[in-house]
Amino acid sequence: MQLVAALAALGALVAPAVAYPHAPMNETLVDVQLTAVGNTMVKATITNKGDSVLNMLKFNTIMDENPTRKVMVFQDGAEVPFTGMMPRYLMSDLTEEFFTTLAPQASVEHSFDIATTHDLSAGGKYVISASGAIPTAEEYSTTITSTALYESNELHMEIDGTQAAAVEQAMKFTPEMQSIHSRALQKRTKIVGGSCNQNTLRATQNALGNSARLAQAASRAASQNAAKFQEYFRTNDANAKQRVIARLNSVARESSSANGGSTTYYCSDTMGGCKPRVLAYTLPSRNLVVNCPIYYNLPPLTKQCHAQDQATTTLHEFTHNPAVASPHCQDYAYGYQQCISLPAAKAVQNADNYALFANGMFYSLFTIIF
């Protein structure tokens, strides 16, 4: 009852207008150049333009080894839909294996096949570009202290559609899974029961309930608390605020029932996306969410400010689904310091800003009441 009372009162929480510390956001520290090295193969050359060593976290960047959204692909001015995964990573106790170290003026190359995460079977002329933010740590450290924004060159490619169609998609959807997914959508079933055991089903249902309450309360806070909205989304523009409120309300609706909604939810992995440190992932092209084994190691609802838990991970993943709110959110940055350092245009489209805002609003009230 105390938790319900805290969530119900959350929207009324008023904070003083104060300044908040930022992790530095450097727009000139990293250079990214794209070149074509095959029909659909792209090479990214990442250069440290600074005068000190950079330890760069690879999660959700151009260097990510998983089939994440590394580039934007356009044909005739329209973006080609992304068919890969949008994961939420466990950000505590990071180890050096997830970083790439670059000396000053040094470069590293990372190649990937864009046909594994985009349907390029139409062939023809495409324009490819990349933009994002790389969390950085100091040499010999894995503590994130800064973030480097990057904007690549525009790469123009002439792609053979037949060759592109022969490339296997990274996220495999078997006929059996397609049948399960279709039945789930026809019945408007959110949780695919066959993917759950008793414990994971209970945890997922509980997370959905908490996600709904957090999103509802955060929506109220967004409309009533200008200082906190400014803190997390870097603006108080009326249009931006309405977009955030609408998205939070949509997440609340999607989370509110395990038997009706626009997404399909799996308690366990079905496509091999649960790589190291992945808590959960979304396939935005299919409005599908998957929990990974380490998701269930998180607390259902944390009492720590800006810590990860099951509820905000579910909330985070729902913002990635276009059926919940369009355009769906991206993964521009992770963690409080990095997210509040994003420019407003990216902050309102970044999934973790929503999860952190919901958590931060709940934690602020929780510490006052308890």
UniProtKB/Swiss-Prot annotation:
Its cofactor is Zn(2+). Its EC number is 3.4.24.39. It catalyses: Preferential cleavage of bonds with hydrophobic residues in P1'. Also 3-Asn-|-Gln-4 and 8-Gly-|-Ser-9 bonds in insulin B chain. Gene3D superfamilies: 2.60.40.2970, Collagenase (Catalytic Domain). Disulfide bonds join 196-267, 274-292. GO terms for cellular component: extracellular region. Keywords: Cleavage on pair of basic residues, Disulfide bond, Hydrolase, Metal-binding, Metalloprotease, Protease, Secreted, Signal, Virulence, Zinc, Zymogen. GO terms for molecular function: metal ion binding; metalloendopeptidase activity. This is Probable neutral protease 2 homolog ARB_03949.
